[in-house]
Amino acid sequence: MIVPSFTFCSTVNALMWNGLEPVFADVDPRTYCIDVEDARGLITPRTVGIAAVHTFGLPADIEPLETLAREHDLKLVFDAAHGLGGRYRDSALGAFGDASVFSLSGTKIVTSGEGGLVTFRDPADAERFTFLRAYGFKADYNCRYIGLNGKLSELNAALGWLSLDLLEPVLAHRHTQVQRYRQALSDCLDLTWQAVPSDCIHGYKDLAVLFREPGQRAAAEAALSAEGVMTKRYFFPVHRMDVYQKFARRALPVTDWLHERLLCIPLYSDLPDARIDAVAQLIRASSNRASAQQEAAGILRCA
């Protein structure tokens, strides 16, 4: 099954638990989502499907992916763990593909503590899933499928249900916070942001800054850490992980390039404006220093 390496490991773990071998695709350097044309080149008679990811909450290139899947009679599954609140052409992200899997874990903008949601195109798949999540049976205790205990507890379900009411206001607030970051760093030419196509609404589970050079990322990370600001280098490419290196059969230059330069910065509901401004100032100052150091080093090498 074709899947991006630039994702959280659980995307690929799920394929392996179902006996599917991952074939790693590269991602688009602007959106960080799966590169449709790269995926096209990986299709063989053994390919059964594509697992695409809505990276950081940005919808993947859905229409071309659905067209590609139809052309080759492939299943299309979306890892929508970051996708609650995101929209593609005015539709919620659960409306696409054969299935979409959303996370409600504690790091998401809507949470049930743990657990998630699954949407299906085919009602028969949805019905089968109700068996699979509860040992494979219903009230009669007659197993029709080999299931597992994947039920959400009543407490977690209640928390998630109540949290859904917060989705729209929380997402609107996050968009305001992101805009404040972008405005504060608009004069920093060594930084770029994840591109958001005009027909998409970003879910902003995470906010990633792309630095021109790895040294600038390292400098910003160190400066922020010194002030007690948590950041993360996200994602660590799956094809580089110990357990998945045997499936790394080709170079993924964009994935590796992003891995060396992206840094996720603070984004949460009660993040004060003053802290956004302070984080932005630290990033700007550290990036400028790193650029000056790299320029000087280049001059010395050429002298």
Model features per residue range: what roles?
Residues A14, G41, S91-L93, V101, ...:
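Short secondary-structure boundary/capping segments
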Residues E37, G49-V53, I62-P64, R87, ...:
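PLP-dependent aminotransferase class I/II
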